[in-house]
Design a protein with these regions (language model features):
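The substrate-binding groove and active-site-proximal loops of carbohydrate-active enzymes
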Residues: 102-108
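Active-site/acyl-donor-binding loops of N-acyltransferases
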Residues: 2-19, 84, 138-166, 289-365
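N-terminal cap/recognition module
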Residues: 95-102
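A conserved beta-strand-loop-helix scaffold within acyl/acetyltransferase catalytic domains
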Residues: 21-73, 80-90, 136-268
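Non-catalytic accessory segments adjacent to catalytic cores
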Residues: 111-155
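Short intrinsically disordered coil segments
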Residues: 97, 169-178, 332-339
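Aromatic (often tryptophan-rich) hydrophobic motifs at membrane interfaces
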Residues: 68-80, 87-89, 100, 112-123, ...
Length: 365
């Protein structure tokens, strides 16, 4: 007995084993499960840090990705997904992450952050990109003059209640009347097991806006890759005409309506307002307490629509580090140099726009 006690006392008295070094790695297929376990546990991480985005982006758009992680003593301490966009028309960039509204480093300590930042910097130089972009929800390098920000995007996030009546009453009067109009007209929401109707409504909407459409296989891959965390919800009239549809992500206690669109009849039946209300109801019933209305550009109709729903805009301080470029990127529909293209695109027949769009949009990110 004395020997057991002495051994235990000696173990307690022994100095703690020093932590091992931080090491940088590229994610391999067998790392995906523990990568995602880290992302789900890390407060800094978002849905857009999940490993599934690598397959979705590479297979949908044919662009190259680098999913870096830092490990210490066999445990992941930080992650940084990156992807390269290379286009004669829109420039050459490395970003975290293209096609995602949030991104950048998600880590538990400063050593991991520094290693991941350094990896991105070295890769950007190696590739010869014009700029590196981090799409963070907060500035990661506020005191580093080599990183720049620009005021272009905002996000709209708001707490929701478990009570439908409370959520309805929180919507400002004018938009609440639109929701009630949709209810009175008998609109209904249906969860789809494929992306067919969603793509139909989405393609119809983006053509009206004059912007290229994503390939249909992109949405199908999102649904297949993220399973129950990716929902397609369509709105129909009482006689089953398609009105609108939205593809949303579920993440922790949040719902993120990400891609959506409406048919021509949507405006007359308040289809878009009803769609987001129907989604809010379903999300609240599922236990969500945050409704993330998503990113919008300042000065756009989408920005005004979300403001009219009572959501407050929060700036997204995306960060840019310049390499071969001498100016911050300006690849967005508000840029005057794209206005002629947008006017011409709106006049295309829908099948032509759906054929040409994916070849252009893969270079936008």
């Amino acid at each position: 007995m004395n020997s057991i006690i002495e051994a235990a006392q000696a173990k307690r008295a022994a100095p703690a084993q020093a932590a091992g070094p931080h090491t940088l790695h590229l994610m391999q297929p067998h790392d995906a499960a523990r990568w995602d376990a880290f992302v789900r546990a890390c407060p800094d991480a978002t849905f857009f840090h999940l490993s599934g985005w690598q397959k979705v982006i590479e297979q949908s758009f044919g662009i190259k990705t680098w999913f870096y992680y830092v490990e210490q003593d066999g445990q992941i301490q930080g992650v940084l997904p990156l992807a390269e966009i290379k286009s004669r028309l829109f420039g050459h960039s490395l970003g975290a992450m293209p096609f995602c509204v949030y991104g950048g480093v998600a880590a538990t300590d400063e050593k991991s952050r520094a290693l991941l930042d350094d990896a991105a910097d070295k890769l950007a130089k190696q590739l010869g990109v014009g700029h590196l972009e981090y799409r963070g929800m907060q500035r990661a390098h506020p005191d580093d003059p080599s990183w720049h920000t620009k005021e272009l995007y905002v996000t709209f996030r708001k707490e929701i209640s478990s009570d439908d009546e409370a959520n309805l009453n929180a919507i400002p009067r004018k938009q609440r009347a639109m929701v009630r109009k949709g209810i009175k007209l008998g609109l209904k929401g249906v969860v789809e097991d494929n992306v067919d109707r969603m793509f139909e409504a989405y393609a119809n909407s983006v053509l009206r806006l004059g912007t290229p459409v994503f390939p249909k296989k992109y949405f199908a891959l999102l649904q297949k890759t993220f399973g129950d965390e990716c929902e397609v919800r369509s709105i129909y009239t009482a006689d089953d005409q398609l009105v609108a549809s939205v593809l949303s992500f579920y993440w922790r206690d949040e719902v993120v309506p990400y891609y959506g669109g409406g048919m021509d009849l949507a405006r007359g039946v308040a289809g878009n307002d009803f769609m987001y209300w129907n989604l809010m109801q379903a999300a609240a019933a599922r236990g969500c307490r945050i409704f993330d209305y998503g990113r919008s550009k300042l000065g756009t109709g989408a920005y005004d629509f979300k403001k009219n729903w009572g959501f407050e805009a929060t700036p997204l301080p995306y960060e840019y580090k310049l390499y071969a470029s001498t100016a911050l990127p300006d690849n967005n529909p508000l840029n005057p140099k794209y206005q002629l293209f947008i006017k011409m695109w709106k006049k295309l027949p829908l099948p032509v726009a759906n054929f040409l769009g994916p070849h252009i949009v893969r270079n936008l990110g």
